[in-house]
Amino acid sequence: MKKKNLLLMLLAVMALLLIPVSVQAAAAKPGTVKLSSIKAVDYNKINIKWKKTSGTTNYIVYYKEAGSKKWIKIKTLDNTKSSYTHTSSSKYPIVVGQKYTYTVKAYNKKTKKSGRYSKTGLTTRTVPAT
């Protein structure tokens, strides 16, 4: 009886070893976001588009007044998005007649790594109010 139980236990262990296990390779940093276009679509709205990159769970959109050194984080989007329209608000204002520069950074929530981003970004001037 002991031999039978031992044999059954041994077979069970061997069966478990044959079950495929998915192994995830160490994830690399997300790729660099390539900015496609920027356009002031109204006096208080600016649209930015980019190409998706691999290894990304989120895209983080930043803006600054042209010439400024400090990027301001304005929105975090999921990885299904490849564009964002920034609408002026009290927290993230857009002033008529000013130039604004935007950039987008790829981020991976699982690995907590960010991809490289365009430090020069894309710049546009707001359109006059009508």
Regions found by a protein language model. Give the residues of each.
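Sec-dependent N-terminal signal peptides of Gram-positive bacterial secreted proteins and lipoproteins
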Residues: K2-A25
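Beta-strand-rich modules
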Residues: H86-G115
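Pro/Thr/Ser/Gly-rich low-complexity, intrinsically disordered linker/stalk tracts
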Residues: A25-G55, V96, K112-T130
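Residues marking helix boundaries in flexible regions
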Residues: P20, N47-K49, K75
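Solvent-exposed strand-loop boundary residues in beta-sheet-rich modules
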Residues: S54, E65-K69, K110-K112
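An aromatic-rich alpha-helical recognition segment common to small helix-rich domains
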Residues: V33, I48-W50, V61, H86, ...
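Recognizes extended acidic, P/S/T-rich segments that occur
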Residues: I60-V95
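Residues that flank catalytic or metal-binding motifs in active/ligand-binding sites
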Residues: T57, S82, Y100, G121
